[in-house]
Amino acid sequence: MSPYVFLIISISLFLGTSLTLFSNHWLMAWMGLEINTLAIIPMMTYPNHPRSTEAAIKYFLTQATASMLVMFAIIHNAWMTNQWTLFQMANSAASVLMTLALAMKLGLAPFHFWVPEVTQGIPLSSGMILLTWQKIAPTALLYQISPTLNMKVLITLAFLSTMLGGWGGLNQTHLRKILAYSSIAHMGWMTIVMMINPSLALLNLLIYIIATLTLFLMLNFASVTKIKSLTNLWNKSAPMTTAILLTLLSLGGLPPLTGFMPKWLILQELVSNNNIIMATLMALSALLNLFFYMRIIYASTLTMFPTTNNSKIQWPYPQTKTINIIPTLTIISSLLLPLTPLLTTLMY
């Protein structure tokens, strides 16, 4: 891809998200979502391949449907309340419709059908943007209308997402599909606490983005897309194998890693709001995710599939600018649990 084209696409992605984040008018927020959608499609179709083209078309059709529902909810709300202000979603029908539309954009179950297929069909770099940056704008809209959301709808979406995100990833062998189902499950954790404590939902999103970004950068650097390919990664870069292990355990929510923090705080919020049954179900659903993370860890660190090069250590990867930020991101995604009191103080 031409550097100029890549620059234009990157600026468009940034502007689209910024427009949604900083607007207080529904029409401008909707325009930001559309700019985001249209900007990433050329990136998804490069390099040109039938699978990436198919994935881009699936993504476009799904996002266009979600955008249509968003616009319908905006118009219905404006018709009933005479308000175009972003914080005014007083009409309950418009609020439910907006929640479902944003759930489709985020890939929450039962609207998750597009996430694994699209992620599997595009390159790792595009998948990284799709599962991290593209979550920011819809989440910001959910955050801003959080006081008017329907709790029953949120709980249903969140529970389905965590369960289906866990079940869907169990028998997968492709890392991109596993990360797609991981994204669905993490969006479920974020959604269930959105109405109770929106700041905690944003913290969960931030930690998820950092950990997923770290993992995608390492997989892209090693050019690995299948679990089987990870078994020889120790030959090329032993430190990267350790970094992948830590990041996956953090995504799984094991203490004392960073990923344990949002799950711990979310379960604490649910229990304090007398949602004990829901907290129990969410904690059990996290075990499904942990299982397929452990499958990846087992394949990458504890096993060695038959290969022509088992004994020789390969020449290490050349030092690049990309690998320089990986240690920093690994530390952030693994070792921030001691900062929990500080972060909770800032949130409350």
Curated annotation (Swiss-Prot):
InterPro entries: Complex_I_Subunit_2 (IPR050175), NADH_DH_su2_C (IPR010933), NADH_UbQ_OxRdtase_chain2 (IPR003917), ND/Mrp_TM (IPR001750). Keywords: Electron transport, Membrane, Mitochondrion, Mitochondrion inner membrane, NAD, Respiratory chain, Translocase, Transmembrane, Transmembrane helix, Transport, Ubiquinone. It is a multi-pass membrane protein. Pfam families: NADH_dehy_S2_C, Proton_antipo_M. Its EC number is 7.1.1.2. One of its GO terms (cellular component) is mitochondrial inner membrane. PANTHER family: NADH-UBIQUINONE OXIDOREDUCTASE CHAIN 2 (PTHR46552:SF1). This is NADH-ubiquinone oxidoreductase chain 2. The lineage of its organism: Eukaryota, Metazoa, Chordata, Craniata, Vertebrata.
